[in-house]
């Protein structure tokens, strides 16, 4: 079984981890409802591309 010859330093470890980034989700403004929603998804009120395609979820 292979074993590392030397311990990985903090600098080496952190340089490798610089590529693990979180990106912000793309958000668009829906003119029909006046709310912001994520792209290519149905809004909470049931609209997609300005058309009503689903019933809105009932608030509990």
From Swiss-Prot:
Instruction: Note the SUPFAM superfamilies from the entry.
Output: Zn-binding ribosomal proteins (SSF57829)
Q: Which InterPro entries match?
A: Ribosomal_bL32, Ribosomal_bL32_bact, Ribosomal_zn-bd
Q: Does the keyword Ribonucleoprotein apply?
A: yes
Tell me the protein's name: Large ribosomal subunit protein bL32
GO BP term, pick one: translation
Q: Which GO terms describe its cellular component?
A: large ribosomal subunit
What Pfam families does this protein's entry cite? Ribosomal_L32p
- Which Gene Ontology molecular function entries are recorded, alphabetically? structural constituent of ribosome
Organism equals Streptococcus gordonii (strain Challis / ATCC 35105 / BCRC 15272 / CH1 / DL1 / V288)
User: Which residue ranges run through the membrane?
Assistant: none
Q: Which family does it belong to?
A: Belongs to the bacterial ribosomal protein bL32 family.
The record's keywords, sorted A to Z, are: Ribonucleoprotein, Ribosomal protein
